[in-house]
C-alpha cells in the first residue's frame, strides 16, 4: 500500500517514515503540493512554486543518502508570508509588496532550511499582520477548513488553515497580539508564541517591533517543540534577540515531553503543577460553549494531578486600549519605509515626489492598515504623546508586573484563547472594535513578552474548534510544552480533522 500522509499524526512519525525510506522527501513534497492545488478554494497560500519546492526536496533526499540528515530533514513546512524568502515572493499580504522578492532569507527560514526542511510555499495572512480574521489580506480572505463560511483567525490564518486542512504538516506564524494562538484555536491545531526575543525577527516584515514574535504551528505540542528546536536561538542580526547571558540559551524543547514532574507518577504525571485561572478570563463576555470546553480541559488536568488556583490579572480589560496605542504607534514608524522609492508598489501616475508618496501609500495599503497608521501617528504626535503613548507604556509595565504576582501563586496560567469560536466571514468587518475585542485574552501575554500557546480542547457552537490557552513565565516554554503534551496524551482533540480535509 503506497504511503499517505493521512496516516501520520505527528512530525516525528513523518520524520521516522523519511528515515526508514518508507517515503522520500520528493514524494512527500509532491503529495502536499497536490493537496494545496486541490484545496485552492481555502485560499491558504499566496505563492507556491513547485519547482523550487521539489528542488529542495531532492536536496533533502541527497543529504539523507550521504548520511547527513537532521531530525527534520525532508519534512515539509509552509512559511507565513511575513518572512522574507529567496525565490518566493514576500508580500506581507499587501498590495504594497505584491511583487516583492527578497535577496535573502529570514533567519527563521534560513534555520529551518539548514535543518533540511522543505518549503511548500508562502501562506496567506492579514495585511502586515494587522487583523484577527484573515479578511484583511490583499489576496482575499482565507476560509476555515472546518466551515468554509467562517474565518480561520488571524493574522496567521493561512498557516493555521494549511495545517488544519492537511496542506502542510507544519507552518510558521507570527504573534503580535495573538496571531499564532487565536488562529490555532479557531482552526483546531496547536501553536506556540515563545518568549519575546527567543526567535529571531531578522527578515520578518515588521508590524510592531516590541511585540512581534515568530513561532511554530502544527498538530501537536511535540511537533511545536521539534520546530522550536530548529527555529529558536540567539541571532546577532536581530537587536531584540535575547543573548545567552540574558537567558537566550539554546535548549532542547522536547526534553520534558512525556516526563513526569519530580515526585509524580506515570498515572498523575503533573502532580504538583499549580495552574492559575485568572478570574478576569472567566467572566462576562466569555461564551458558554467556549467556557464549557475549557472547564472540561481543566478537569482533565486535575485528573493528571495538577491543582487549580484562582489568580487575578486586574488590568486585562486595559490590554485592548494599551495594545491599540502601542502597536499602531510602532506600525506608523515601521511602515513609513514603504513609499514607492526603493521597492514595492509605486503609483503609475504622479506630479512630483510628494504626490508619488501620497498616491503610492493610498493605493498600496488596505483600509485596516491605513486606520492603524493614522491612530499610531496621532498618538505619537506633539501634545498627545504623553497622554496616550507614554501612559500606555506605563500600564504595559503594570500588566507585566501583574503576571509576576500571579506566577508567585502558580506555575502555569490557563484559560480560553478567545471569547468565542470562529465567526462567520464578514460578520465583524464593519465594526473594527468588535474585531479588536476578540483578542482580549491574548493581548496581555504579548504586552508582557511571555510565552503562550493554544492547544485544541473541544468544540463549541457550529462544531467549531475551541483552544485552551497556556501561559508560562519567561523562558518557560519547555514546561508549557510538557503540560500541553501531557494533555494531548490523555485526550484526542488534537487528532480530530475537518471532514473535508
From Swiss-Prot:
GO terms for cellular component: glutamyl-tRNA(Gln) amidotransferase complex. GO terms for biological process: translation. It catalyses: L-glutamyl-tRNA(Gln) + L-glutamine + ATP + H2O = L-glutaminyl-tRNA(Gln) + L-glutamate + ADP + phosphate + H(+). PROSITE patterns: AMIDASES. The active site is at 80 (charge relay system), 155 (charge relay system), 179 (acyl-ester intermediate). It is an enzyme of class 6 (ligase). GO terms for molecular function: ATP binding; glutaminyl-tRNA synthase (glutamine-hydrolyzing) activity. The keyword rRNA processing does not apply. Keywords: ATP-binding, Ligase, Nucleotide-binding, Protein biosynthesis. Its EC number is 6.3.5.7. Belongs to the amidase family. GatA subfamily. Allows the formation of correctly charged Gln-tRNA(Gln) through the transamidation of misacylated Glu-tRNA(Gln) in organisms which lack glutaminyl-tRNA synthetase. The reaction takes place in the presence of glutamine and ATP through an activated gamma-phospho-Glu-tRNA(Gln). Heterotrimer of A, B and C subunits. This is Glutamyl-tRNA(Gln) amidotransferase subunit A. It comes from Cupriavidus taiwanensis (strain DSM 17343 / BCRC 17206 / CCUG 44338 / CIP 107171 / LMG 19424 / R1).
Amino acid at each position: 500500500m503506497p504511503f499517505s500522509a493521512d496516516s501520520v499524526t505527528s512530525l516525528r512519525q513523518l520524520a521516522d517514515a523519511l528515515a526508514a525510506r518508507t517515503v522520500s522527501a520528493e514524494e512527500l513534497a509532491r503529495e502536499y503540493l497536490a493537496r494545496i492545488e486541490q484545496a485552492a478554494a481555502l485560499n491558504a497560500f499566496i505563492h507556491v512554486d513547485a519547482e523550487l519546492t521539489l528542488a529542495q526536496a531532492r536536496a533533502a533526499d541527497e543529504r539523507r543518502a550521504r548520511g547527513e540528515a537532521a531530525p527534520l530533514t525532508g519534512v515539509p513546512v509552509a512559511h507565513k508570508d511575513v518572512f522574507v524568502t529567496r525565490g518566493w515572493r514576500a508580500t506581507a499580504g499587501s498590495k504594497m509588496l505584491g511583487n516583492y522578492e527578497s535577496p535573502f532569507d529570514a533567519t527563521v527560514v534560513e534555520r529551518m532550511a539548514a535543518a533540511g526542511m522543505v518549503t511548500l510555499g508562502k501562506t496567506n495572512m492579514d495585511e502586515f499582520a494587522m487583523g484577527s480574521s484573515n479578511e484583511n489580506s490583499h489576496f482575499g480572505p482565507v476560509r476555515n477548513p472546518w466551515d468554509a463560511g467562517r474565518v480561520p483567525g488571524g493574522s496567521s490564518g493561512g498557516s493555521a488553515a494549511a495545517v488544519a486542512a492537511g496542506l502542510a504538516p507544519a507552518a510558521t506564524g507570527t504573534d503580535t497580539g495573538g496571531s499564532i494562538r487565536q488562529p490555532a484555536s479557531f482552526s483546531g491545531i496547536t501553536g506556540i508564541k515563545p518568549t519575546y526575543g527567543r526567535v529571531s525577527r531578522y527578515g520578518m516584515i515588521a508590524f510592531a517591533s516590541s511585540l512581534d514574535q515568530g513561532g511554530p504551528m502544527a498538530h501537536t505540542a511535540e511537533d511545536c517543540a521539534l520546530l522550536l528546536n530548529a527555529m529558536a536561538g540567539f541571532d546577532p542580526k536581530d537587536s531584540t534577540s535575547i543573548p545567552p547571558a540574558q537567558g537566550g540559551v539554546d535548549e532542547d524543547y522536547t526534553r520534558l515531553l512525556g516526563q513526569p514532574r519530580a515526585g509524580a507518577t506515570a498515572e498523575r504525571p503533573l502532580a504538583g503543577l499549580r495552574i492559575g485561572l485568572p478570574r478576569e478570563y472567566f467572566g462576562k463576555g466569555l461564551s458558554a460553549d467556549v467556557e464549557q470546553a475549557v472547564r472540561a480541559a481543566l478537569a482533565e488536568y486535575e485528573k493528571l494531578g495538577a491543582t487549580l488556583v484562582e489568580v487575578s490579572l486586574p488590568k486585562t480589560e486595559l490590554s485592548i486600549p494599551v495594545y491599540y496605542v502601542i502597536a499602531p504607534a510602532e506600525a506608523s514608524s515601521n511602515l513609513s519605509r514603504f513609499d514607492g522609492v526603493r521597492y514595492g508598489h509605486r503609483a503609475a501616475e504622479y506630479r512630483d515626489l510628494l504626490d508619488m508618496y501620497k498616491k503610492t501609500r493610498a493605493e498600496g495599503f488596505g483600509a485596516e492598515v491605513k486606520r492603524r497608521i493614522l491612530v499610531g501617528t496621532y498618538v505619537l504626535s506633539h501634545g498627545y504623546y504623553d497622554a496616550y503613548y507614554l501612559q500606555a507604556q506605563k500600564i504595559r509595565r503594570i500588566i507585566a508586573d501583574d503576571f509576576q504576582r500571579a506566577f508567585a501563586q502558580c506555575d502555569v496560567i490557563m484559560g480560553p484563547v478567545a471569547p468565542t469560536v470562529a465567526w462567520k466571514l464578514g460578520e465583524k468587518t464593519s465594526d473594527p472594535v468588535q474585531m479588536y475585542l476578540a483578542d482580549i485574552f491574548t493581548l496581555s501575554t504579548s504586552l508582557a513578552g511571555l510565552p503562550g500557546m493554544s492547544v485544541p480542547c473541544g468544540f463549541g457552537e457550529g462544531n467549531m474548534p475551541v483552544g485552551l490557552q497556556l501561559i508560562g513565565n519567561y523562558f518557560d516554554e519547555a514546561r508549557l510544552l510538557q503540560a500541553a503534551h501531557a494533555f494531548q496524551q490523555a485526550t484526542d482533540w488534537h487528532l480530530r480533522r475537518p471532514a473535508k480535509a
